[in-house]
């Protein structure tokens, strides 16, 4: 693959490349350029040159290009699905689902262009008005993760481009090929030179440089909390606007009156989707003591049936890389050494053929996990979940909220009073009641505490890419009177 700068596909200026591995087999899938600071400068200069032309276009004109990209992606959606399977390790049904999500998101944003409005506000007299315009920030750096490498690219690119910003896309080094595929569709759709640039490479080499660049106006990043904190530190030098979607530690709460089958299906989705590599993945399981044994028995049985291996026919894919496997093993080792009860899994599976070297890990269920354990306090990002019983709503709220993160949460109950009370008591940006995700395009994806700041999706997410500009107008005739200025100063001029 190549990077894309100033309307040209090119190699890194150093010629250096990095290997990309297939998570399912451990085999080399491709190589991609390791961009340099010179490449970053070239991309930023190109984006700066293109900004005036792009922002001067109407939102309708920009939307037409996005819509053409939507048509091209829809036409070749099977290619995207296959790429997600190979590069990310997704099983086929998950890859297909993400592809459809990409199409839905892009359609949502292309249809929003007629809703980009400002306000006219009354001034201090009847002949004064305040015109509040929404204008693009300028150059946007979009840093995207590997866990949903297509959906997250679109969730950042589409609103940024629609609102008149120019973009430099920096995808994860674990999924650069998906980003390249999507950028090609925008190029084929006729996006002008410099409006969209693609940079790949090591964050350690270009990460700090790109986010602290003086010409960058907005940075949007989905990733770890530690990375987000570093970006905040570096970007503060130039006061760049930040949209940061970071860590999560979702509580999955099942009350005594819950529909067990509905809760089980949703838990399988929330825990094992993408092998638990999701910021909204269920990582803490709280079940009412009256149904705890019944629920856990069924959850274990369902988890035993999950097939690993061939993405065409399996239920759960591999972790993204060797490091992710080691991290998962670290938390399971903590459980073992601490005496927690491992009810299922806790090891890598024994697979044969080309999948034997893949980064697979078995569904793992652990109980007797204390609230202060790393398994309940730190984001694991793997197919591991700790379980605990609760006896009261106060205990439920206290334990659910006991997290440094505050992104997604799940509640299963038939009690309307509990539903509405929990919607106020649970301090998370998203509460899914009697359903799994996924987040809808028209929903606002945001969180509390160390989950980040600002948000994405919906009309609120689009507004994050626009700066409110105020124009104060006095259209009265005659002399102007200002209370703090002496009119005598202007006599006989």
Swiss-Prot record:
Keywords: NADP, Oxidoreductase. The active site is at residues 245, 279. SUPFAM superfamilies: ALDH-like. Stable for 2 hours at 60 degrees Celsius but activity is decreased to less than 50 percent within 15 minutes at 70 degrees Celsius. One of its GO terms (molecular function) is glyceraldehyde dehydrogenase (NADP+) activity. Optimum temperature is 63 degrees Celsius. GO terms for biological process: Entner-Doudoroff pathway through 6-phosphogluconate; gamma-aminobutyric acid catabolic process; glycolytic process; protein homotetramerization. Optimum pH is 6.6. Substrate binds at residues 147, 155, 279. Pathway: Carbohydrate degradation; glycolysis. Its EC number is 1.2.1.89. It catalyses: D-glyceraldehyde + NADP(+) + H2O = (R)-glycerate + NADPH + 2 H(+). The record marks 147 as: Transition state stabilizer. It holds the Pfam family Aldedh. It comes from the Archaea. The keyword Phosphoprotein does not apply. NADP(+) binds at residues 144-147, 155, 170-174, 202-208, 223-246, 279, 379-381. The keyword NADP applies. Belongs to the aldehyde dehydrogenase family. Glyceraldehyde dehydrogenase subfamily. NADP-dependent dehydrogenase of the nED (non-phosphorylated Entner-Doudoroff) pathway with highest activity towards glyceraldehydes (e.g. D,L-glyceraldehyde and D-glyceraldehyde), to a lesser extent towards D,L-glyceraldehyde-3-phosphate and glycolaldehyde, but no activity towards aliphatic or aromatic aldehydes. Homotetramer. Dimer of dimers. PANTHER family: SUCCINATE-SEMIALDEHYDE DEHYDROGENASE, MITOCHONDRIAL (PTHR43353:SF5). This is D-glyceraldehyde dehydrogenase (NADP(+)). The lineage of its organism: Archaea, Methanobacteriati, Thermoplasmatota, Thermoplasmata, Thermoplasmatales.
């Amino acid at each position: 693959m190549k990077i894309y700068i100033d309307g040209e596909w090119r190699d890194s200026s150093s010629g250096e490349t990095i290997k990309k591995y297939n998570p399912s087999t451990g085999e080399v899938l491709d190589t991609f350029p390791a961009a340099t600071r010179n490449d970053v400068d070239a991309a930023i200069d190109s984006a700066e040159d293109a900004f005036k032309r792009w922002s001067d276009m109407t939102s309708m004109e920009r939307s037409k290009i996005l819509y053409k990209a939507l048509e091209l992606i829809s036409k070749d959606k099977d290619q995207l699905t296959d790429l997600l399977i190979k590069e990310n390790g997704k099983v086929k049904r998950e890859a297909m689902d993400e592809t459809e999500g990409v199409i839905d998101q892009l359609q949502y944003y292309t249809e929003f262009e007629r809703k980009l409005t400002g306000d006219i506000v009354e001034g201090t007299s009847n002949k004064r008005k305040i015109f509040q315009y929404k204008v693009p920030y300028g150059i946007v750096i979009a840093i995207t993760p590997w866990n949903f490498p297509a959906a997250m690219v679109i969730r950042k690119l589409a609103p940024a481009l629609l609102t008149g910003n120019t973009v430099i896309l920096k995808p994860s080094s674990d999924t650069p090929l998906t980003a390249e595929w999507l950028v090609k569709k925008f190029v084929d759709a006729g996006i002008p030179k410099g409006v969209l640039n693609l940079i790949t490479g090591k964050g350690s080499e270009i990460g700090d440089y790109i986010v602290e660049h003086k010409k960058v106006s907005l940075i949007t990043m989905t990733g770890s909390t530690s990375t987000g904190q570093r970006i905040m530190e570096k970007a503060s030098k130039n006061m760049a606007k930040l949209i940061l979607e970071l860590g999560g530690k979702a509580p999955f709460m099942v009350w005594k009156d819950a529909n067990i089958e509905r809760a089980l299906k949703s838990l399988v989705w929330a825990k094992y989707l993408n092998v638990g590599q999701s910021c909204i993945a269920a990582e803490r399981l709280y079940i009412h003591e009256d149904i705890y044994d019944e629920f856990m028995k069924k959850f274990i049985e369902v988890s035993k049936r999950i097939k690993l291996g061939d993405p065409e026919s399996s239920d759960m894919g591999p972790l993204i890389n060797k490091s992710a496997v080691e991290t998962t093993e670290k938390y399971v080792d903590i459980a073992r050494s601490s005496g927690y009860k491992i009810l299922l899994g806790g090891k890598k599976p024994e697979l044969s053929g080309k999948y034997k070297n893949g980064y697979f890990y078995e569904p793992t269920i652990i109980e007797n996990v204390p609230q202060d354990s790393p398994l309940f306090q730190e984001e694991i990002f793997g197919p591991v979940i700790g379980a605990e019983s609760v006896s009261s709503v106060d205990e439920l709220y206290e334990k659910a909220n006991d997290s440094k993160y505050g992104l997604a949460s799940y509640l299963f109950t038939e009690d309307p009073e509990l539903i509405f009370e929990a919607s106020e008591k649970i301090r998370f940006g998203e509460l899914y009641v009697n359903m799994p995700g996924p987040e809808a395009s028209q929903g606002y994806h945001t969180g509390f505490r160390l989950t980040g700041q600002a948000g994405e999706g919906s009309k609120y997410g689009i507004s994050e890419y626009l700066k409110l500009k105020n124009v104060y107008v006095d259209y009265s005739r005659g002399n102007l009177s200002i209370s703090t200025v002496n009119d005598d100063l202007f006599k006989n001029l």
